């Protein structure tokens, strides 16, 4: 299965995730949904917040797809959660990649997070 197939089928195909992307740990984009362009610098900042120190997110927020999100919480070393009005996003780090998924107004944050986290668990179990 290709990286794009994971985005299209495993994430967007659930109807619980409105937009998604998968990046390498260097910030390079492997695949993304149409119009959801997370810059390598944004992915790298998210990775730094997950693996090192999320405190800059408290004051500055988190930039994803050139949109500023309010930092909600983190699971150190694993994930961050953020929102922008009635929308939000979750980013989960695996051994070799970063999954970013967003939900839109009318979608449930917990359902979106669960889908992203389950795919991350699958990647981790398979060495990614």
Label each region the model flagged.
Residues 1-128:
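Non-catalytic interaction/Regulatory regions outside core domains
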């Amino acid at each position: 299965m290709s990286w794009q197939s994971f985005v299209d089928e495993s994430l967007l195909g659930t109807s619980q995730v409105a937009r998604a992307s998968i990046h390498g740990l260097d910030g390079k984009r492997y695949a993304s949904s149409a119009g959801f362009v997370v810059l390598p610098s944004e992915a790298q900042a998210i990775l730094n917040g997950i693996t090192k120190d999320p405190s800059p997110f408290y004051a500055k927020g988190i930039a994803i797809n050139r949109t500023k999100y309010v930092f909600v919480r983190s699971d150190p070393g694993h994930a961050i959660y953020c929102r922008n009005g009635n929308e939000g996003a979750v980013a989960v780090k695996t051994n070799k990649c970063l999954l970013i998924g967003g939900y839109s107004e009318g979608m449930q944050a917990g359902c979106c997070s669960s889908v992203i986290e389950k795919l991350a668990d699958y990647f981790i179990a398979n060495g990614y």
